[in-house]
Amino acid sequence: MESLQLFTRQTKAISTARRSLLVIESIPGIRYNEIVEVVLGTGESRIGQVIEVGKVTTVVQVFGGVSEVDLLSSKVKYKGETLKLPVSPDLLGRIFDGSGHPIDGGPPIVADDYHDINGIPANPASRMPPAEFIETGISAIDGLNVLVRGQKLPIFSGSGLPHNKIAAQILRQASLKGKTEEFAIVFAAIGVSYDDAGYFISNLEETGALSRAVGFINTASSPVIERLSTPRLALTAAEYLAWEQDMHVLVILTDITNYCDALRELAAMRGEIPSRRGYPGYMYTDLASLYERAGRISGREGSITIIPILTMPDDDITHPIADLTGYITEGQIVLSRALERKRIYPPIDVFLSLSRMMKEGIGEGNTREDHNNVFMQSYATYAEGNYLREISTVIGSEALSDRDRIYLDASDRFEQEFISQDEFYRRSVEETLETAWNIFSMLPVEDLKLIQEEYIKKYLPETSK
């Protein structure tokens, strides 16, 4: 009876077809986000999604556009359900498009179940705080802005900066210490070019990272509505792997700016009143519906950690996308154009970057006992060196003391040896800490005021004692 009813819930009362939207007559029982099938006069069919429900009219976003939709001969069939992702352990090692269809040449997924891409809200009382160190192999993150299991830590980038290279490097290198077999990566590329899509796919395949990863690739030429479904498909796959397969999942979403631009475009199509810089007023809520799917849940072995990557228009960190993301997430990694000009990779600005959950993932039992002291002394040393560099441009380097020159050299070494590393080199957290100690060995021992004496005796190279 239910399948028969699905075929009777249809209409030919299409009043408007504009860009990728259809405005049709409302019928009883229509739900927001419901999937529809648009059947053209030629017999060809396209999938759409209900994005607005009114008493008189309903607005449908059509995947693939409405250029061939004839108002008289086309009809809309309602499916009675929302967009769902087929899930099974076979998701690992596969690559899909922004609608959930395989694009890697493999067969369709034989589903154990179908999960709504909008997710199921977790009981707030069952949520556990982020904890436990995730090693990315990048010193500027592992040493100074630690990523913790269950955290949401965005990367703020700019046009032309190497955020794609950093995303690919994290894809290859990230792991949970001692639990490699339980660790998985879910990657979503939103509105990327064909070149970028090819880069991510080849990177996953050539490095072997694909065996523990699931990829969702949405290209810039795909329908706008797919920009909105792509991260939700990725997070649905992550929830399945985390909550049903007991895996620790790291989700990388790039580029959130393309996602928000799609929100703005759809809002403009629907004639909504814009908010800041033309973005819809509900963008904060919409972004929160993505980011808040990260976390740890009591009684579940798995976890979801999210790294959203966004490009800030005009490098403006006060832009609404970066601003709202900063309110929801627990810190940020900021890329620096100044460091990029110095050919330092990854160009992470450690002064603007912050991980609010860092102290939950460092120290004995997670990284090493001296990590917090090394973290504080690294910032102090680099900050003083940067200050002296600015002063020397005014008063001249000749006016600097011998001690000042030591700090200038230490600051340069910090950029060249600690922050900078090859994109294919995975630096362990132990190596990261040792690199910092080697830089500290340049300084007078009495200047290491932020490090406990027992750690100085234990870790400082003998030549400087």
Outline where the language-model segments fall:
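Phosphate-interacting basic helix/loop segments used at nucleotide- and nucleic-acid interfaces
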Residues: M1, K79, T136-I141, A234-A237, ...
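Active-site phosphate-binding and catalytic loops of NTP-dependent enzymes
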Residues: E2, E44-G48, L83-V87, H101-P108, ...
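N-terminal accessory targeting/assembly segments
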Residues: M1-R94, S99
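Residues that form or immediately flank small-molecule/cofactor binding pockets and catalytic motifs
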Residues: R19, K55, G100, A122, ...
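Generic beta-structure capping elements
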Residues: G41, V53, F63, G98, ...
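Short beta-strands and strand-coil junctions in structured, solvent-facing domains, enriched
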Residues: V23, R46, V56-T58, S67-V69, ...
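P-loop NTPase catalytic core
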Residues: G143-S464
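P-loop NTPase nucleotide-binding/switch module
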Residues: S74-V76, L83, D90, P102-Q151, ...
